[in-house]
């Protein structure tokens, strides 16, 4: 949503969520369509189909789970990851984020702190068309991904979590490394 390209704070996020259309409401063990309403209508007791009852915490949690933004605020911060891809790809996204978030955040911050907000937004909007060839701050996304991938890898190595197969989490990044090395995304393979 355009809102997320502006200066966002918690109040704006809360306003966005309560004014977001309801997908459905759970009521007395059944799902009721919420298509005609926004969550604020629910808060104001204006939904006759459910006896004008007010929402509870579970209703809010359900509503938040139907809003598909890049990040969602729940009892934790949920980052949208890669989807519509194979197993290796599905595991790469969370591993990448884990390595960044649990690694050297200062190194990642130093890298991105000088980036221009409008150029980031422009790259975000261009990426669906241009993929990794999208320009950001004078370099393509292949470059930035490879730099961030190295930061992530260092973070996973320092966590040193060993799985059942005896590997640490860095092996989940193999899929992303292959994409960067070959400069071929899943979309490139399909075309």
Regions found by a protein language model. Name each.
Residues 1-191:
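C-terminal accessory/tail domains of diverse enzymes
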